[in-house]
Amino acid sequence: VTGGRPGSVPERGGSEQTAVPPPPDILFRRFGPRAELLARYAAWLAGPGTVRGLLGPREVPRLWERHLLNSVALADLLPDGARLVDVGSGAGLPGLAVACVRPDLAVDLVEPLLRRTDFLTEVVADLALGQHVRVVRGRAEDSAVLDKVGSAQFVTARAVAPLDRLVRWSFPLLRPGGSLLALKGTGAEDELAEHQQFLARMRAEVRGVIECGAELVDPPTRVVHLVRGR
């Protein structure tokens, strides 16, 4: 969409949606011009995203620190040219946020709800990300989804499900030796301890809890790293 000020998304009728707070300077220092794509995505979340019920209006003032910076911190853990599947992508967090700043990645956004996949498809088209981002409608456990996105190097998820369910859904999508990078909060270690026996049965190698993005967001993003056994 063109013609609006940075950080806003014009409606179809021409008026502007809710403006998002300006992006922090650190974003441009880290990601250069790609940060502008993330700012446009932020405007989609603050405008159409809130109108369609994908993001609560009260989240708009803290959109950067609570949602976007928390998500793009994941980029630090992904090697060049990696293939990433975002399970239960919702409004695109974290997968679409990461795709905005990492054009080298191949990203699949897996989401079962039509209103969410419609939103994701519109944003991907508007930001011209279609060459390296796909929107896949379905549940992670669906055979059709497995056929499309299986054998991934990395699967990620944010605020989707407890760790045991997330492993059940995501491990079939991973190649042997592939990694689940689950964004979790302060309870990450407790979840690992709670599901220790289940993870052993699933032959999940626990690599621990990684803190990343300390220069972007405080507190840093906390990621549970599990590897599918070979």
Where are these regions (language model features)?
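Conserved beta-strand/loop positions that form the S-adenosyl-L-methionine
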Residues: V87-S89
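S-adenosylmethionine
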Residues: P6, L105-D108, P112-R230
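Flexible, active-site-adjacent loop/turn segments at secondary-structure boundaries
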Residues: R52-G53, P61-R62, A91, R158-A161, ...
